[in-house]
């Protein structure tokens, strides 16, 4: 497992309290990243156990939903694929747009880019995009300025060498991290603004066509840019051909 640089200890002085808080925030973020990397290292073992559980379920004909959002998610199909470093399936295929188009540190729609990940408000939302029925992944590194990849047994996990926007993506698994200094409602449109990609009822990224949006398996009416980002929410955008809404299994992810 890659080693992680220890954050510098805060120094005494008039700004000691602020530095102490920054240090504590960095420690919390570092601990979260450590848990993610440990989880990634255990994916193979978890998958093996999962095979046994699936076989048992098939025998007795019953199943149990442990995901916090499973009961409220109307989508009947679950996204599948190799588990990534956040124990959410990695998205395969041609990315919708490169992460390199994203903003490079300037404030975007009130959202700042800071050297440490903020932890006062910390949730995760999943976004899936289909274009004419074909999955178009979100690339890792959106909202992470000058990203650096940490290689894990389950794929790359990106961290910033400069700063993190409060909305960002660590891996190519569709998970949008909302990590902000205060609790407020952020939107999908703000995420696309950081990415510098279009999002309207007729366009997603550079792709034009009728856009159908789903939130937790339920069709969303209105401007997709206004969709709020909420904890363990599954958002799906279909450009052109409509795909039956899908969800992810959050129950194994430490998110």
Predicted feature residues:
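Hydrophobic single-pass membrane-targeting/anchoring helices
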Residues: 28-62
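Ubiquitin-like/PB1-type beta-grasp interaction modules and other compact soluble beta-rich domains
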Residues: 2-4, 50-255
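Terminal targeting segments of Actinobacterial cell-envelope proteins
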Residues: 1-34
């Amino acid at each position: 497992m890659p080693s992680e640089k220890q954050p510098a200890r805060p120094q005494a002085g008039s700004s000691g309290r602020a530095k102490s808080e920054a240090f504590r925030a960095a420690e919390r973020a570092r601990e979260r990243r450590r848990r993610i990397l440990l989880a990634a290292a255990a994916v193979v073992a978890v998958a093996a156990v999962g095979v046994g559980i699936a076989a048992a379920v098939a025998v007795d004909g019953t199943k149990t939903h442990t995901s916090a959002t499973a009961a409220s998610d109307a989508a009947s199909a679950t996204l599948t694929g190799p588990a990534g470093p956040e124990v959410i399936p990695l998205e395969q295929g041609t990315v919708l747009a490169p992460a390199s188009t994203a903003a490079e540190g300037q404030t975007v729609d009130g959202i700042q880019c800071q050297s440490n990940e903020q932890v006062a408000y910390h949730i995760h939302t999943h976004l899936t995009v289909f274009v004419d029925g074909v999955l178009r992944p979100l690339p890792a590194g959106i909202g992470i300025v000058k990203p650096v990849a940490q290689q894990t047994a389950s794929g790359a996990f990106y961290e910033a060498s400069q700063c993190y926007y409060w909305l960002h993506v660590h891996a190519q698994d569709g998970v949008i991290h909302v990590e902000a200094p205060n609790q407020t409602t952020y939107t999908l449109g703000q995420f696309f603004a950081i990415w510098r990609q279009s999002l309207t009822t007729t366009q997603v990224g550079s792709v034009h066509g009728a856009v159908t949006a789903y939130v937790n398996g339920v069709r969303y009416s209105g401007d997709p840019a206004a969709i709020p980002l909420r904890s363990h929410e599954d958002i799906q955008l279909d450009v052109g051909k409509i795909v039956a809404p899908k969800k992810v299994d959050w129950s194994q992810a430490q998110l």
